């Protein structure tokens, strides 16, 4: 008995060695003391892309610390501009309606069909009649019921991620949708009991955007849209459809200090995502905090204004000089939505090891809203969006000119 146990232990030891050998095969990177010293002198000048900085016995020399802090904060401001683009765009959209329409509120459907009503909306179609609005899940689950028929739509959170399409491209293929939208703070007793035919979706934000396009004649559209129900659980009431009155409301991000004021409003209206806590610290160093008034110092104000300017230049570059290979196509065409995961925008911003940053900034600067069907197109059951900013010779396309697209 003792011998058997001893043999078993020996076999176990061998197995452990075999298992651990691959992990220890890779050597840790090393650096000599001389290499270490050469890269950052104790006393001397450090030459960088952003200029020269002097060290005195390892300390930043007199006056250098202020320059370094300015550099640090300017870099943070420009990256925070890119980070906040989706949230600022969605917040401005909702807030614009709050300011423009006396009767506008959550759970309202805005009837958008005229030129000025869609002029301020990024990438809105010129001829499509839209019905859209915002809901809030903080006090109760958002209930959305869509009748059977020809409709296309989506649900989107405030970071422009989408849990689902609705209508003919949704999971029920136009047979009718009974949606329960739950947010991070929805009370458990304000969520309905599960029911057959009901689809429950969990959002990362309290607020939700919904869009519907009813297809058919004017009479068919009116009949369908009047059957749509939008309300918070336990507070069912008739859904109000509000005429957009040909009013211009912008949903694109404002410029200058107005951008940061809108971002301050946005973060105070929403739940902080775990992935964004470090960015929230950056905002704090620039005078923007959740739960506190927007009161940046004179220095912070200058940095924020400059950061918005540089950040927008970065966003324009991401849009018009695309370097993400996963969305590029032949003859200067590229995918506006979709493309290779990690490079293209999808209905989710999460990949296995990271959340996308540049693709999200690129898309949410030039357009608005995503959905599974728009970003993972399938023949016959989805949509595809491609774009082109240059002609075949590399010349920039101009809005005042006419062009012919030849399909062969």
Model-assigned labels for residue ranges:
Residues 21-25:
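Sec/Tat signal peptide C-region and signal peptidase I cleavage site
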Residues 10-20:
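Bacterial N-terminal signal peptides
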Residues 2-11:
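Bacterial N-terminal signal peptides that target proteins for export
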Residues 26-408:
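A compositional/structural signature for long, glycine/proline-rich flexible linkers
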């Amino acid at each position: 008995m003792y011998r058997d146990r001893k043999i078993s232990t020996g076999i176990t030891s061998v197995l452990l060695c075999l298992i651990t050998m691959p992990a220890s095969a890779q050597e840790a990177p090393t650096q000599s003391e001389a290499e270490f010293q050469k890269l950052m002198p104790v006393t001397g000048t450090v030459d960088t892309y952003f200029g020269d900085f002097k060290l005195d016995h390892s300390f930043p020399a007199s006056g250098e610390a202020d320059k370094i802090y300015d550099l640090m904060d300017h870099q943070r401001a420009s990256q925070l501009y890119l980070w906040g683009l989706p949230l600022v765009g969605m917040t401005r959209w909702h807030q614009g309606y709050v300011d423009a329409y006396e009767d506008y509120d959550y759970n309202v459907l805005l009837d958008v069909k005229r030129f000025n009503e869609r002029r301020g909306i990024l990438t809105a179609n010129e001829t499509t009649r839209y019905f859209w609005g915002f809901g809030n899940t903080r006090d109760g689950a958002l209930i959305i019921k869509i009748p059977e028929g020809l409709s296309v739509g989506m649900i989107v959170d405030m970071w422009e991620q989408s849990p689902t399409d609705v209508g003919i491209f949704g999971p029920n293929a136009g047979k009718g949708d009974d949606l329960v939208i739950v947010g991070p703070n929805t009370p458990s007793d304000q969520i309905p009991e599960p029911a057959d035919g009901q689809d429950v979706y969990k959002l990362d934000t309290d607020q939700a955007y919904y869009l519907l396009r009813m297809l058919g004649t004017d009479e068919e559209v009116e009949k369908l849209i009047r059957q749509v129900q939008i309300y918070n659980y336990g507070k069912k009431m008739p859904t109000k459809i509000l005429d957009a009155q040909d009013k211009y409301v912008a949903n694109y991000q404002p410029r200058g200090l107005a951008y940061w004021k809108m971002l301050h409003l946005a973060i105070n209206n929403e739940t902080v995502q775990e992935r964004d806590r470090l960015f929230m610290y950056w905002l704090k160093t620039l005078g923007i905090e959740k739960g506190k008034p927007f009161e940046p110092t004179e220095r912070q104000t200058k940095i924020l204004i400059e950061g918005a300017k540089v950040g927008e230049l970065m966003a324009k570059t991401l849009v018009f000089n695309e370097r993400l290979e996963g969305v590029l196509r032949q003859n200067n065409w590229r995918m506006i939505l979709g493309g290779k995961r990690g490079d293209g925008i999808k209905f989710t911003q999460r990949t296995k090891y990271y959340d996308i940053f540049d693709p999200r900034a690129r898309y949410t600067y030039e357009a608005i809203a995503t959905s599974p069907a728009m970003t993972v197109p399938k023949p016959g059951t989805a949509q595809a969006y491609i774009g082109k900013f240059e002609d075949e010779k590399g010349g920039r396309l101009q809005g005042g000119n006419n062009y012919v697209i030849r399909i062969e």
